C-alpha cells in the first residue's frame, strides 16, 4: 500500500530545484519550469514512449467511427491519446504523470469544433490540447506546499521536545518502571529518531538541489534510516496493541524475558522489509536520493506497516468491546457508558495509529482534499506530541510522582536554606502530601494496578480484563 500522505510530500521534494522564493509576487507571476532529475527524466521519457506505443496500437484496434455527422479523428497529440470525438464536444482526460511538474489530479482538454476539426491555437494555427491546468506549480499549490512544509517542521520539533521530556521522566523516576512503560519508552524513542531524521531531510536535503543532483550515497543512507525508523515506529505501535490485547485474553506477563519478543518485533523485523526495499530500489528504481514516491517498490515497506495497522485496528475494536461489556455488567447509565467508550477509543487511537486505517484515501474533491491534507498532516507530524501528552503528561501516576518529587525538593530546599515559621508549616504539609501520594509504593495503574507482592499471573482472564479497564478508564479521565 502507498500512504496517501507520502504523495503530498512530493511537492516538498519538487521544490529542491527552486530554492529561491517562489511564492507569487505582484510584479512576477511567472514560475520557473521544474528541471527533472536525470533518472526521473528518463523514467518520464520511458512512460511517454510506452503511452505513444499503446496509443497507436489502440487506434489500430478500435473499429471505425460509427456515429452520425462530422467528427474529429483519433489522434496522438504528442502527450496523450484521443479517440474519435463528435463535433462540438470537449474531450477531457486526467493529466499524465510523466514528470514531477505534472499534476495527475488535474484535467487536460481537447476541443473538436463544429466542423469536425481539432481546435487550433490562434497564435500558430496548430492543433492544440489544453495542458495549462496540468502545471503542478501554480501559486496556490506552492503556497499550500509551504504551509504543509512548515507544519511538518513545527510538528516534529514539538514532538521531539515533548517526547524527550517524557522519556526523561520515565527513565529518571524508576518507580514508574514496568513492562508497559518499557514499551512506551521504546515507542517514544522511535518517534524521536524518526522526527529527527525527517527534520534533517526537510532542512538539509529538500532545499538543496545541488546535493540531490550530485546524488551522494549519504542521502540514500539517510533515506534508508528514515524508512527503517518509520517502520519501527509503526511496529512498536503494534507491540503496544499486542500488549494491551494480551491483558484481555491471557494473564499479564511478569517475567522480563517476554520483552525480548517485543524487541525483536519492534526493532528487528523492520530491518527485513527496509533492507529488501533498499536493494530493489538500487537495482530497479535508483532515482536521485530516492526521493520519488512513484514506485511500487514502496509496497515492500508500506505493506507490512499497513498489516500492522489493520491488526491494531482489530485490537482496538476488541478492547472497546471488553470495555463496553464490563460497563454493562456494572449497570452504568447507557449514555455514560458510551461516553466512556468513546473517550477510551480516542485515547487509544494515537497510540495504535488507527487514524491511518480509518482515513486511508484522500478525497478527490479539492476542498475536501485540502481539509484531508491538513487534518492528516497534523496527525502525522504532531502524533509524537499527542502521544507524549496523553501517555505521560496527562497520566495520573506521572503527575502524582512529579508532585511528590516537587514537594520533596521544596522540603530539602527549605531545610538547606532555612524558612520562616509559616514556610515550615507549609513544608510540613507538603511532606505529608508527599507521603500520602504513595511513598515508595509502585505506581498504581500505569503498571496495571498490580500490588508489588501479589503474583500477577493468578488474576485470571477476568482480572486481566479489569486491569485493562482500569488503565483505559483512568487514562481517559486524566
UniProtKB/Swiss-Prot annotation:
The protein's name in its UniProt record: Calcitonin receptor
TM regions (residue ranges): 147-169, 182-202, 220-242, 260-280, 297-320, 341-359, 368-394
Cytoplasmic side: 170-181, 243-259, 321-340, 395-478
SS bond list: 55-81, 72-112, 95-134, 219-289
Provenance organism: Cavia porcellus
Glycosylation sites: 28, 73, 125, 130
Entry's localization field: Cell membrane
Topological domain ranges for the Extracellular compartment: 23-146, 203-219, 281-296, 360-367
UniProt family annotation: Belongs to the G-protein coupled receptor 2 family.
GO biological process, one term: positive regulation of cytosolic calcium ion concentration
Signal peptide (from-to): 1-22
CDD domains: 7tmB1_calcitonin_R
InterPro entries associated with the record: GPCR_2, GPCR_2-like_7TM, GPCR_2_calcitonin_rcpt, GPCR_2_calcitonin_rcpt_fam, GPCR_2_extracell_dom_sf, GPCR_2_extracellular_dom, GPCR_2_secretin-like, GPCR_2_secretin-like_CS
Location (main, coarse): membrane
One protein family per Pfam: 7tm_2
Keyword tags: Cell membrane, Disulfide bond, G-protein coupled receptor, Glycoprotein, Membrane, Receptor, Signal, Transducer, Transmembrane, Transmembrane helix
Assembly, per entry: Heterodimer of CALCR and RAMP1, RAMP2 or RAMP3; the receptor complexes function as AMYR1, AMYR2 and AMYR3 receptors, respectively, and respond to amylin/IAPP, calcitonin/CT and CGRP1 ligands. Interacts with GPRASP2.
Record's function text: G protein-coupled receptor activated by ligand peptides amylin (IAPP), calcitonin (CT/CALCA) and calcitonin gene-related peptide type 1 (CGRP1/CALCA). CALCR interacts with receptor-activity-modifying proteins RAMP1, 2 and 3 to form receptor complexes AMYR1, 2 and 3, respectively. IAPP, CT and CGRP1 activate CALCR and AMYRs with distinct modes of receptor activation resulting in specific phenotypes. Ligand binding causes a conformation change that triggers signaling via guanine nucleotide-binding proteins (G proteins) and modulates the activity of downstream effectors.
GO molecular-function term, one example from the UniProt record: calcitonin receptor activity
Membrane topology type: Multi-pass membrane protein
